[in-house]
UniProtKB/Swiss-Prot annotation:
GO molecular function: GTP binding; kinase activity
Organism: Methanoregula boonei (strain DSM 21154 / JCM 14090 / 6A8)
Residues involved in GTP binding: D40, V41, V42, D59, E112
UniProt protein name: GTP-dependent dephospho-CoA kinase
Gene Ontology biological-process entries: coenzyme A biosynthetic process
Catalytic activity: 3'-dephospho-CoA + GTP = GDP + CoA + H(+)
Enzyme class (EC, first level): transferase
Family under the similarity heading: Belongs to the GTP-dependent DPCK family.
InterPro entries: GTP-dep_dephospho-CoA_kin (IPR007164)
Amino acid sequence: MFVLPDESRQLFKDPFGTLHRDIGTVLPELAGRTIYSVGDVVTHSLQQNGITPAIAVVDGQTMRSPCIKMPEIAGPCIHVKNPPGTITDELVSALTHAVDHTPVTILVDGEEDLAVIPLVIAAPLSSIVIYGQPNEGVVLRIVDDQAKTAARRLLTQFTKTESPIPHN
């Protein structure tokens, strides 16, 4: 398990890609691409626009409250535990498996926000990872070598632990 120390949390407030004010502005960029989504609202918005993400990572929450607009489950649903501020081995394993077995919905018990990092690492080149940036819009990240390197660099900010419970 990777645990994000409190002193490193601020590094993850900035968008990890290009910020767009609403989903409508990114739709043209998604045509013909493999799309991976993280977050209930962005996944629901994609589905409302006729796009089924190859992988949808959701947790039933929006800004720490129950999500009113739940996305539909596409393909098999993998349930994983991922406490806030962590990236569990279970989540990484599910993402790695899902990349080769799409479409898949990964339902997280805990928090899915940080799933963007291992998803960018696992996703094939030229695919797109899209996620919601609370109160700002959606973030689009085209997966290329630079994105994978940046994701691996962000992962170095975490503490690797074998403990199933984070110690913050």
